[in-house]
């Protein structure tokens, strides 16, 4: 871990540009959404759009704006999937959704922020949410796993080679090594 900066600088000189794994993963996940998994994405976006039309606060969002915001949230999703049900989600699930939305907002400052607030209510359905809203949330949860697999494992891992041994399923090429304490804590 102590030589991570040196290796990154060497890699950047080798490829001729500054590159970070989170950016490569983001671009690769956007590619997966737009190409390999686009039909599933269109079905999901249509379902989210139908939800938006049911509420006066969100009915002015166009299908196009929902697609753009949803694509960004999916591309920024930090984990394979969440397991959220109406009003019930672990702190980790809520944190993953909030992190994805925050990163999507950061990467797209010109996008209307209220659409991200609406998407949060879709992805984290409140207690008492109706079956339609729950099904849309579940569809999103089922969609993010193949996007992660296709975007990160099958694409980003083949585009980012600072230290190839980090590019394994379950690995994170952005992090070089762990402390002994972290290793023992993970094995408890």
Report the location of each language-model feature.
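Alpha-amylase-like alpha-glycosidases and glucanotransferases acting on alpha-linked glucans and related
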Residues: 1-89, 94-188
């Amino acid at each position: 871990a102590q030589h991570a900066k040196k290796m990154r600088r060497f890699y950047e000189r080798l490829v001729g540009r500054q590159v970070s794994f989170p950016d490569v993963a983001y671009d690769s996940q956007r590619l997966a959404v737009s190409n390999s998994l686009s039909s599933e994405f269109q079905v999901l976006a249509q379902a989210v759009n139908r939800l938006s039309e049911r509420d006066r606060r969100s009915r002015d969002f166009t299908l196009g704006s929902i697609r753009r915001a949803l694509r960004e949230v999916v591309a920024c999703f930090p984990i394979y999937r969440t397991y959220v049900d109406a009003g019930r989600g672990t702190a980790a699930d809520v944190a993953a959704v909030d992190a994805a939305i925050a990163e999507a907002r950061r990467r797209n400052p010109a996008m209307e922020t209220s659409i991200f607030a609406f998407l949060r209510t879709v992805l984290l359905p409140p207690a008492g949410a109706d079956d339609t809203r729950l099904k849309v949330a579940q569809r999103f949860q089922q969609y993010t796993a193949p996007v992660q697999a296709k975007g990160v494992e099958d694409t980003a891992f083949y585009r980012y080679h600072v230290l190839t041994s980090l590019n394994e399923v379950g690995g994170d090429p952005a992090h070089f090594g762990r402390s002994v304490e972290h290793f023992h804590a993970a094995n408890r």
